[in-house]
Regions:
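N-terminal "arm"/small-domain region of PLP-dependent enzymes with the aminotransferase-like
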Residues: 24-82, 173
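Phosphate-binding glycine-rich loop
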Residues: 90-129
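N-terminal secretory signal peptides and thylakoid transit peptides that target proteins
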Residues: 1-16
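Short N-terminal helix/helix-N-cap motif within the alpha/beta-hydrolase-1
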Residues: 111, 117, 135, 221-223
Length: 245
């Protein structure tokens, strides 16, 4: 996003910035409650200790962390009594350098999920909906409903691709569009030119609507037409790109 971290927090407003904490904290309990109430989750817990278990629905690495990662974790234990202020700055600087952006354009979260929830709180209201296709990664829509924000869910097309025209039509008056590219769980991809045209169409239809482009699966894309939307976000204050690692 071309605005700074300070501008993003300011967009929450003085009142909302104070109110954001309670819904975000309560949501963690809500997630646990949902998991307990779902039979497949209960079965998942029973099977979690089975030897050689591979849970492809969770995109987990069955081999676990690599040796270098384990060593880095072990080395860090000696500093666990300290607040990671310098480490946070170092991480921000490393991400900014790798992506070719200013450090002030990078925001860290506890997984991208925290940033998705913060975006819902920042950009949606009781009369400015979240637009999230169906199906897509469900966390933003689930959280929006939890905090009683309206959700509009345009269905994917016959090829399981996000229906860009339907999303543009639904964007009028919306606060936030959640655009997962590649899309989870349909594994469909929109090329760079398509995404650029889509952003322009939304800007024309609803100039104040923010578009959050989730690139969680960026590293796995083989489609040559695909491009990251980071350059679009750097040029457009109404576009945010999230990644996870």
């Amino acid at each position: 996003m071309s605005v700074s971290r300070r501008s993003f927090v300011a967009s929450l407003g003085a009142g909302t910035a104070g109110l954001i904490t309670a819904p975000l904290i309560r949501w963690h309990g809500h997630e646990a409650l949902l998991a307990q109430g779902q039979p497949e989750r209960r079965a998942d817990r029973l099977l979690a200790s089975a030897p050689g278990m591979i849970r492809v629905d969770s995109n987990e690495n069955p081999n676990g962390p690599g040796q270098r990662a384990l060593q880095a974790i072990s080395n860090a234990f000696g500093h666990a009594n300290r607040y990671p202020v310098k480490e946070e700055d170092d991480t921000l600087a490393a991400i900014a350098k790798a992506r070719g952006v200013a450090q002030s354009n990078v925001i860290l979260g506890c997984g991208s999920g925290e940033l998705l929830r913060a975006a819902v709180m920042a950009f949606t209201t009781s009369d400015r909906a979240l637009v999230a296709p169906e199906p897509t990664f469900e966390a933003p829509a689930n959280f929006a409903r939890f905090v009683q924000r309206p959700v509009v869910a345009p269905p994917v097309d016959a090829k399981l691709r996000l229906d860009l025209d339907a999303i543009v039509a639904a964007s009028r008056g919306a606060g936030l569009i959640y655009f997962c590219n590649p899309n989870n769980p349909t594994a469909t991809v929109h090329g760079g030119d398509e995404v650029a045209s889509f952003v322009e169409a939304v800007n024309r239809a609803s100039p104040e609507t923010v578009i959050l482009i989730d690139e969680a699966y960026h590293e796995y894309v083989a489609d040559k037409s695909y491009r990251t939307a980071i350059p679009i976000a750097m040029a457009n204050p109404h576009v945010v790109v999230t990644r996870t690692f």
